[in-house]
Amino acid sequence: MTDVTIKTLAAERQTSVERLVQQFADAGIRKSADDSVSAQEKQTLIDHLNQKNSGPDKLTLQRKTRSTLNIPGTGGKSKSVQIEVRKKRTFVKRDPQEAERLAAEEQAQREAEEQARREAEESAKREAQQKAEREAAEQAKREAAEQAKREAAEKDKVSNQQDDMTKNAQAEKARREQEAAELKRKAEEEARRKLEEEARRVAEEARRMAEENKWTDNAEPTEDSSDYHVTTSQHARQAEDESDREVEGGRGRGRNAKAARPKKGNKHSESKADREEARAAVRGGKGGKRKGSSLQQGFQKPAQAVNRDVVIGETITVGELANKMAVKGSQVIKAMMKLGAMATINQVIDQETAQLVAEEMGHKVILRRENELEEAVMSDRDTGAAAEPRAPVVTIMGHVDHGKTSLLDYIRSTKVASGEAGGITQHIGAYHVETENGMITFLDTPGHAAFTSMRARGAQATDIVVLVVAADDGVMPQTIEAIQHAKAAGVPVVVAVNKIDKPEADPDRVKNELSQYGILPEEWGGESQFVHVSAKAGTGIDELLDAILLQAEVLELKAVRKGMASGAVIESFLDKGRGPVATVLVREGTLHKGDIVLCGFEYGRVRAMRNEMGQEVLEAGPSIPVEILGLSGVPAAGDEVTVVRDEKKAREVALYRQGKFREVKLARQQKSKLENMFANMTEGEVHEVNIVLKADVQGSVEAISDSLLKLSTDEVKVKIIGSGVGGITETDATLAAASNAILVGFNVRADASARKVIEAESLDLRYYSVIYNLIDEVKAAMSGMLSPELKQQIIGLAEVRDVFKSPKFGAIAGCMVTEGVVKRHNPIRVLRDNVVIYEGELESLRRFKDDVNEVRNGMECGIGVKNYNDVRTGDVIEVFEIIEIQRTIA
């Protein structure tokens, strides 16, 4: 046969070249794809494959035996029980060499066992023969001794009977010899029978041990048998034992089986442990072997704690957390108590608390983000457009009445400041101004202390902060706060020193004061530009605009003009005719009329857009503030505004945010710490002022709520029962009536239905347009709830000149009033060497012999002190009264 290549052989065998090369390598032949293969190498490969693909290495045999057992019952009735015994044996094929070795070992073992058995039988025979011989010799000795005794006794008899006795003795001797021979024969037979039984027993034991060694040591075949018994009583278990012995050993019910069977009357004599052992023996053991050990629990306690990966969402109940850690809920509650938090098993806890508890208990925490839908919606946007320069967003900040809005009015050439209630700004105004050098967007923030959050929001949404400081007033508290907001937001500051036209203006003082807070002018080596302006005369306005544009040019402000818009809510309110209205500052992209927007918890389609002049616009680019209509509700000021593609997904995200906010809020409200519990217990009675607040815009609601809550003291607390944007409705009036609250309207009015409820319930309704007045009146209401302060006021002093004894009043002090007036029934103190030794009240006050109500300065009188007789000459009696002083909220 000619040699062929690997490729040709692979094509003939219909296999791949790589597999064929691997098969040759397994057979011990190294080949490559282009090598030739000889006939001998082919045969070697075929032998290798045949040997590899030989028959199965394991054979399993199963056997099932069924039997029926009749059990006698009460009343003469018998009960049939079906018994089924299942057995399974597995035979493992071995290698020929291993099989030969095991066969040789088995043959050697069998020979050794046979030799041991023969030696045991011979030894048993020898022992039995020696024993029989010893017993026969002893018997003969005893008989000889008895014969000798009888012969001696016979000699004493009468001589005439000697012949007869001799004959009888000879006959008796013959008979005894015959009996001795018979006894010897029986003893030999008994010894031989015992020897045979002993030999059989030893042989049986040796054979059984050999079989056990063969099945346990050689491991061929391996046997895995399991018995499944259906038992109903102790009789059934006994029958199962007998059936197992018949099936496994092939032996009948012999004497041993009968001996093993208990007697009928013995059923109750067995102890509980014996019955448990018998039951365990019936059911236990591989290969049908019975074990006498009692039942044992198979579970063992883990050697160390199991650390798990616990996945925690934004909120989770205590019970769910315990299930994730595979522990009891009580253990989680104990761990939370150690951390200082009280909770029940069904209470919702936030993610941070759950993480602390899980890590405290030694588990690894995986925080799960549940806002995949929100991320998917927010990431589905038009991106990739080139960034273009945009107009700067400038926030005007400063102290109240320093001229921020007036300065902006001059720039816009309008009269906005005169329209504000009280002449102070209470909203964020957003405007954009076209100048010769470009467009600028201005945000005008309030300067009053109550509007801290508005100023912070304005600083976050801005590029440049213009800090307005009055030259005649200098740095004030809100000026410092504006500097802090600007530094926190990381935006540059341009200082406008206003009211420079006033005679008392001092710009250098402003520079010195601002330098203490890190605002240094450029001429002093700092980074802030200082511009002197006058909002009234218009001086320095152009320089201020140039400084703003110069700062914007340094910042290189850019934004993507094309694509889907995003921005922030500057202000929001509820218009009675138009619905929810939000002032939005666009940051990037272009906002079109008809776009679908997602804004915090609200969503909707933009139905209309207006600029700050009230004119309709169709689109708004970066840095342009517009009012949008069409949202599902009033958004919170500061919320992100994003244009999305799908209104359905926007609705789902908004609803998800609402539900998640509610869950997180509930979890935080329920979190009760031990120290808070004890503080509430010791707090005692606290008066509350309940308020239902309605305002025109969201920012005002936020500012007023913060200001009112800060008024709370340890004795009087302010609770905002309800708040919202828009007019006062019937629902608000009903809520105020139910909670005994004050209705407060800030720049809003109550409708007709609400007024009817207010009149019927006699509710306290108050309207305000300036935040100063609102806060002052709430302070007055809280002051009326404060308990008055008690103050002791000394009204007179009397010096003891002499002491008299009275049978009715005891010791009477004769006194001279040295100061003020002494009144009867007023509390007094007795002073000795300027030390108070007694405090009580006057019982008797007399001038001469007449009782009087009061004695004035310079007059003598007799004073009887109630329940006190230790009055001495030289003591001073101090008379005082307690007056109430009404407290006020600071």
From Swiss-Prot:
GO MF terms here are: GTP binding; GTPase activity; guanosine tetraphosphate binding; translation initiation factor activity
Q: Which stretches are annotated as coiled coil?
A: none
Q: Where does GTP bind?
A: 398-405, 444-448, 498-501
Segments of this protein annotated with the region G1: 398-405
Keyword match Cytoplasm: yes
Q: Where is this region: G3?
A: 444-447
Polar residues: bias regions: 67-81
Q: Where is the composition biased (Basic and acidic residues)?
A: 92-217, 267-280
* Modification sites for N6-acetyllysine: 808
- Where are the residues of the annotated region Disordered? 45-304
Start-end of Basic residues biased regions: 252-266
A GO CC term attached to the entry: cytosol
Main localization is cytoplasm
Checking CDD domains in the record gives: IF2_eIF5B, IF2_mtIF2_II, mtIF2_IVc
Write out the ranges of the annotated region (G4): 498-501
- Renumbered to this chain, region (G5) spans 534-536
> Where is this protein localized, as stated in its record?
Cytoplasm
List, alphabetically, the InterPro entries matched: DNA-bd_dom_put_sf, EF-G-like_DII, EFTu-like_2, IF2_assoc_dom_bac, IF2_II, IF2_N, P-loop_NTPase, Small_GTP-bd
Name all tr-type G domain ranges: 389-558
Q: Where is this region: G2?
A: 423-427
Alphabetized, the UniProt keywords read:
Acetylation, Cytoplasm, GTP-binding, Initiation factor, Nucleotide-binding, Protein biosynthesis
Question: What does this chain do?
Answer: One of the essential components for the initiation of protein synthesis. Protects formylmethionyl-tRNA from spontaneous hydrolysis and promotes its binding to the 30S ribosomal subunits. Also involved in the hydrolysis of GTP during the formation of the 70S ribosomal complex.
> What is stated as this protein's family in its record?
Belongs to the TRAFAC class translation factor GTPase superfamily. Classic translation factor GTPase family. IF-2 subfamily.
Query: What protein name does the entry list?
Result: Translation initiation factor IF-2
The species this protein belongs to is Escherichia fergusonii (strain ATCC 35469 / DSM 13698 / CCUG 18766 / IAM 14443 / JCM 21226 / LMG 7866 / NBRC 102419 / NCTC 12128 / CDC 0568-73)
Q: What is the lineage of its organism?
A: Bacteria, Pseudomonadati, Pseudomonadota, Gammaproteobacteria, Enterobacterales
